[in-house]
């Protein structure tokens, strides 16, 4: 018998099939570097920096930039930003630099060059006969990297916001230690011609390398980071939200997880804390894993850990936090159940769950719980089984324990209390809800609740 086959009838005809499904569509890639080789890219021939500067600057003024030339120039210009490594720098077993070493952004990565010449079509700027100064190079590098940040701003009605951000960044690169090299609004005009450049792997890679360098090295031109800072923890919104959440509620990650009372958290918690990653290591390649090409499908994004993401932002909504009210709900990750969990969580100022305990301190606690469940003995009801949880204030340490919180939810039938709903409605009443946001979900779901 083939254990992989299933047999059935279709119109009285016996059919035998071996069900096979797409697998790689769902596979997340962890960023850990196992071969101890630095992240790398391949670019064209190393350009003459004077020629490249003139070509790129004239292209910027004409709002016509070649991404290959821009990447080649950005990589070549890395030698201009030398700094001193403050401590021994190691990540994933790779020795990046020793304390006191002179390093540049190029030290962090491997950049391979071919013999392919760039276009370097000097359509303008021929009046620049002298060599560009380092401040001029720094200004051009900074403006080019700002294109990355601008291309990451997406969504409706972002026109004015994007223009304001572009103007502020432009101002940075026309004041000391930088120098003005383009006219006002040039950056925004250029961006419109390069609106999707954040999707270009080599450009994203170089932005990440510059950011990783300036994030650690004290440097005269560290303000270049204004355009690259969005590469830090990119596609990591799920893990970043969880980190901010446990800081807000003043619990350790281990303590907070004990309040995640829903089965669907299991896979996500396992995914977020995969062994061998450097999630807690400062200045690790992990921080820039997306831009450096170490992961195609992030296991730490909001979609990868959607239940955790939904829960945390429902708690934020309960607290009236604008960021949470504006965040986009992951519709496929039980938003109704997560809103119940978030209501209790918010009331207690930390974790609350829905329907069942799923995480335990150790194996014995898990076994004790399963034994109690199997015999239908709900031992957790013993301490406050007579409490009317809608009228009682719970602020003692005992009532904030995972056992007490879980009991309270079960006593209310896994539903929000009237006080939770009133709180949700009140904190979002004066907020202009964005489409598909948590605020819109709460308005639609609870504003007309008869309770």
From Swiss-Prot:
Pfam families xrefs: Rhabdo_ncap
GO cellular component: helical viral capsid; host cell cytoplasm; ribonucleoprotein complex; viral nucleocapsid
GO molecular function: RNA binding
Keyword Ligase: no
Post-translational modification Phosphoserine, affected residues: 389
Domain of life: Viruses
Keywords per UniProt: Capsid protein, Helical capsid protein, Host cytoplasm, Phosphoprotein, Ribonucleoprotein, RNA-binding, Superantigen, Viral nucleoprotein, Virion
Principal cellular location given in the protein's record: virion
Subcellular location: Virion; Host cytoplasm
Post-translational modification: Phosphorylated by host.
Family designation: Belongs to the lyssavirus nucleocapsid protein family.
Assembly with partners or alone: Homomultimerizes to form the nucleocapsid. Binds to viral genomic RNA.
Role: Encapsidates the genome, protecting it from nucleases. If expressed without protein P it binds non-specifically RNA and therefore can bind it's own mRNA. Interaction with protein P abolishes any non-specific RNA binding, and prevents phosphorylation. The soluble N-P complex encapsidates specifically the genomic RNA, with protein N protecting the genome like a pearl necklace. The encapsidated genomic RNA is termed the nucleocapsid (NC) and serves as template for viral transcription and replication. Protein N binds protein P in the NC through a different interaction, and can be phosphorylated.
Name of the protein described by the UniProt record: Nucleoprotein
Organism encoding this protein: European bat lyssavirus 1 (strain Bat/Germany/RV9/1968)
């Amino acid at each position: 018998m083939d254990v992989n086959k299933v047999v059935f009838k279709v119109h009285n005809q016996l059919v035998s099939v071996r069900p096979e499904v797409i697998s790689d569509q769902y596979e997340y890639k962890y960023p850990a570097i196992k071969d101890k080789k630095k992240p790398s890219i391949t670019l064209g021939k190393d350009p003459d920096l004077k020629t490249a500067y003139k070509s790129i600057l004239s292209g910027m003024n004409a709002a016509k930039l070649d991404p290959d030339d821009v990447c080649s120039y950005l990589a070549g210009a890395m030698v201009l930003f030398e700094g001193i490594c403050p401590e021994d720098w190691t990540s994933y077993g790779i020795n990046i630099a020793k304390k006191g070493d002179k390093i540049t952004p190029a030290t962090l990565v491997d950049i391979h060059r071919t013999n392919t010449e760039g276009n370097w079509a000097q359509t303008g700027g021929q009046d620049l006969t002298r060599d560009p100064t380092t401040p001029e190079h720094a200004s051009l590098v900074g403006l080019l990297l700002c294109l990355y940040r601008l291309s990451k701003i997406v969504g409706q009605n972002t026109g004015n916001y994007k223009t304001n951000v572009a103007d502020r960044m432009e101002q940075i690169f026309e004041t000391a230690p930088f120098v003005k090299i383009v006219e006002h609004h040039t950056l925004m005009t250029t961006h419109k011609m390069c609106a999707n450049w954040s999707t270009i792997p080599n450009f994203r890679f170089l932005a990440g390398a510059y950011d990783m360098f300036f994030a650690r090295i004290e440097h005269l031109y560290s303000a270049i980071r204004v355009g690259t800072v969005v590469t830090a923890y990119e596609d990591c919104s799920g893990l970043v939200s969880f980190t901010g959440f446990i800081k807000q509620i003043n619990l350790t990650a281990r303590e907070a997880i004990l309040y995640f009372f829903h089965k669907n958290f299991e896979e996500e918690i396992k995914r977020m804390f995969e062994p061998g990653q450097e999630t807690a290591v400062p200045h690790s390649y992990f921080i820039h894993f997306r831009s450096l090409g170490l992961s195609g499908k992030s296991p730490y994004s909001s979609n990868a850990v959607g239940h955790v993401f939904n829960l945390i932002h429902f708690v934020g909504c309960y607290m009236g936090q604008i960021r949470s009210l504006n965040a986009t709900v992951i519709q496929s990750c039980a938003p109704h159940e997560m809103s119940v969990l978030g209501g209790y969580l918010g009331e207690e100022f930390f974790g609350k769950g829905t329907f069942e305990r799923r995480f335990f301190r150790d194996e014995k606690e898990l076994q004790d719980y399963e034994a109690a469940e199997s015999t239908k003995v709900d031992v957790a009801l013993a301490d406050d089984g007579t409490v009317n949880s809608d009228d009682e204030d719970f602020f003692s340490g005992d009532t904030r324990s995972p056992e007490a919180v879980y009991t309270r939810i079960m006593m209310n039938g896994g539903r929000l209390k009237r006080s939770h709903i009133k709180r949700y409605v009140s904190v979002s009443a004066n907020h202009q809800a964005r489409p598909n946001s948590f605020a819109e979900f709460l308005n639609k779901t609870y504003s007309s609740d008869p309770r």
